[in-house]
Amino acid sequence: MQKIKSLMTRQGLKSPPESLNDLGAFESLRVPGKEEFRELREQPSDPQAEQELINSIEQVYFSADPFDIVKYELEKLPPVLNLQELEEYRDKLKQQQAAVSKKVADLILEKQPAYVKELERVTSLQTGLQLAAVICTNSRRHLNIAKEGFTQASLGLLANQRKRQLLIGLLKSLRTIKTLQRTDVRLSEMLEEEDYPGAIQLCLECQKAASTFKHYSCISELNSKLQDTLEQIEEQLDVALSKICKNFDVNHYTKVQQAYRLLGKTQTAMDQLHMHFTQAIHNTVFQVVLGYVELCAGNTDTKFQKLQYKDLCTHVTPDSYIPCLADLCKALWEVMLSYYRTMEWHEKHDSEETAAASEGSNVMSTEETNFDRGYVKKKLEHGLTRIWQDVQLKVKTYLLGTDLSIFKYDDFIFVLDIVSRLMQVGEEFCGSKSEVLQESIRKQSINYFKNHHRIRLDELRMFLENETWELCPVKSNFSILQLHEFKFLEQSRSPSVSPSKQPSATSSKPVTLFEQYCSGGNPFEIQADHKDEETEDVLASNGYESDEQEKSAYQDYDSDSDVPEELKRDYVDEQTGDVPVKSVSRETLKSRKKSDYSLNKVNAPILTNTTLNVIRLVGKYMQMMNILKPIAFDVIHFMSQLFDYYLYAIYTFFGRNDSLESTGLGLSSSRLRTTLNRIQESLIDLEGSADPTATLTAAEERKEKVPSPHLNQLVILTSGDTLYGLAERVVATESLVFLAEQFEFLQPHLDAVMPAVKKPFLQQFYSQTVSTASELRKPIYWIVAGKAIDYEQMLLLMTNVKWDVKEIMSQHNVYVDALLKEFEQFNKRLNEVSKRVRIPLPVSNILWEHCIRLANRTIVEGYANVKKCSNEGRALMQLDFQQFLMKLEKLTDIRPIPDKEFVEIYIKAYYLTENDMERWIKEHREYSTKQLTNLVNVCLGSHINKKARQKLLAAIDDIDRPKR
């Protein structure tokens, strides 16, 4: 029944997974015979009905556990038996038995073909095995016959042949041993010729051959000798490798690398090479410094050789410091150049080997070579930083071994130049920013520069106090680029000047120092200073250069050596400095020079010797900043102090006048006042002597300040004949404006080196200080304008005029002629001054503007002093003023006349009604309380009554109250 159940399960029957047991209890459940199978299959059937019958069989009949079926069925009987129900149940069991029997019969018949086929396969396998046994038996029999007939007869022949082969091999071995005994002579010759690869190749081959014959007693001694020779070769190879560090030779290094590759020690060679480079750096710097120390000591004392490098550096004298530093950098350059060329060699050979490997070779060998190549590459790249770090530390030790504060400025600049060049080498060598060198030289530079700047400020104060403000005669085409201190700007234009031109300028890769000096030379060779060979052609024979001299210079085309090269071309881009390709003909240039003669003469720069010294000082500061960019902010800060102090001195000498601010004319802008206050607080030491009770912090702050300068006693500013020192005022003020223009010109260069975080300081300096230079013109020239014309005399003349006339006058008053005469005299004296010093048009305009404005305000003040005035008197005022304007316009080209409306509006206000005048008073606050009050009082009785007068005076008082 278990098999029946399993067959039913494989057929996908849903009957419970249990088997029928103990079928003997029911005869009706016996397995049908073949006849019954046939009958069952012949009976018509409904598969679905049969499946339902099978599914209706109780679970217990499929159970694998044995149980009593009869007992089970009897226990199921009800207490009261019903025959009909029993028969129905019995029929049901019979139907279930028939369905199961039929299903079993179907399954058996279905599997019968497979059973027959498998039985046939087993029978065929049995037949094949029997045939194989027969073949094996026959084979064994034939093998025994062959063994007895052939093997024993051939053994003698084989033994003789073997003996022959052994003897031949012995003969070859003896010959090889003989050759090996003679190789030591050849090895010595190859070592003397420095043919290391050949020697190693021969030695390795001998060792390989010797290992083959190690069973011979005579070989052991030879093998030991070859091993000693190989070790000797390695020692000589290491010495040869060390020579690479100072003088790289391609052929020599190629032999050494081939030798190490034959030894299989490529990685070891690279480790040794870096040790040699480190040792070479130490030995090189020590020997260079030791040589200078012993030379300066003047004796052969050996105590210096026992000193540490750090202690040895402290014995270098100031005189030999720069040559020693240059030689030190030159020697270190040779070491770094050798390393650079070593890397070049490996890059070249790696590419060649890669190309050869791509053509096909041993895969294992290629992988090993690639591994070695990768190791060497990483080692070399890592070594760049290590070697540069060693170089930095050695140079840093040397730099800190001597106090640089005692050096002259040019010597210190030279030291910075060498260190800057060394940092450039470091950047090209390994991309390093040389933080160690930068920090060491930055601290020394700032300390040096602070002391240097303090001395320069004191010198500037001395120059200013001794300056007589005479014109320094420079040529009309003067440019600061013609000064030696600014030559470096022409050699290396700032990249920020022309950002749009950068791609084209850098389209070709710049040549590095290693590429430039790879074949020879040294970037640290001390070059002679060529400044003395060049002469600055900036000074003229006098302030203007005589007309004959200049005209002849312009007429003679060949005598244009003083004209900058840029001016000879078509045009120069002011932003980029680039010159177009288009050329200019000789005729065009000649005509242009003639036409520009007067223009150049008019535009000749106005500056003093002190101005020129400040400009030169700025150039020197920029040289230091250009060489050592990390201190750019400090240098620019000190440069700004030079300008601040110059500006403050000009203001103190010529523009300080408390009465100016009381005029309320806004002569000094709030920006200018803020700038002057800032300079006074941060830079000017207002205390005459040091206060012993001052704190240490205050003393340090005062140390950074400079006393306020005093005007030279030779400069007379009180003489009316010279227009109260107008010539000196013009030279001083316009020299400041010129200095500001030069700072504007230098702004792109300063901006290019200024750190990004500090650029707001530079922008603030230019917007709040440099740009205010021209604003000093107003207060300085106002003092001249206030004294050049006798305004008090005009007021006295106006008080003598009778303004309450009853008829309209046709003749103007005398004070107008007196005032015009004063202006004519002023114009005459102005022309006299212009013969000494060129007065620029903006200065002339400011002077005339100040004088006219003061005159007009004096006229209004005179009208405000009038006690009584009629309508005809007001008409006379208008007549006087119109006459004054008409004559004044012939003396000056200023249009419109300053404060013209200020007078006219005041005169016309006399005719206003009460309401209009009240509104007019509130709208015109530019008039003083006295002037407004007088206007109301004069109008009393004519068209304003007392009540209206009180109202208007109250309005004036309301306006004046906030001013108190």
Curated annotation (Swiss-Prot):
GO BP field: endocytic recycling; protein transport
N-acetylmethionine PTM sites in chain numbering: 1
Subcellular location field: Recycling endosome; Membrane
Sites of the Glycyl lysine isopeptide (Lys-Gly) (interchain with G-Cter in SUMO1) crosslink: 963
Family matches, as Pfam families: Syndetin_C, Vps54_N
Covalent link location (Glycyl lysine isopeptide (Lys-Gly) (interchain with G-Cter in SUMO2)): 963
PTM sites of type Phosphoserine: 15, 494, 498, 559, 561
Disulfide bond sites: none
Main location: other
MF terms in GO: SNARE binding
Ranges in a coiled coil: 81-107, 216-244
GO cellular component, one term: EARP complex
Top-level division of the source organism's lineage: Eukaryota
Signal peptide location: none
Keywords on record: Acetylation, Coiled coil, Endosome, Isopeptide bond, Membrane, Phosphoprotein, Protein transport, Transport, Ubl conjugation
Subunit annotation: Component of the endosome-associated retrograde protein (EARP) complex, composed of VPS51, VPS52, VPS53 and VPS50/Syndetin. The EARP complex interacts with EIPR1. Interacts with VPS51 and VPS53 in an EIPR1-independent manner.
Stored PANTHER family: SYNDETIN
Family: Belongs to the syndetin family.
Biological role stated in the UniProt entry: Acts as a component of the EARP complex that is involved in endocytic recycling. The EARP complex associates with Rab4-positive endosomes and promotes recycling of internalized transferrin receptor (TFRC) to the plasma membrane. Within the EARP complex, required to tether the complex to recycling endosomes. Not involved in retrograde transport from early and late endosomes to the trans-Golgi network (TGN).
Protein name, as recorded: Syndetin
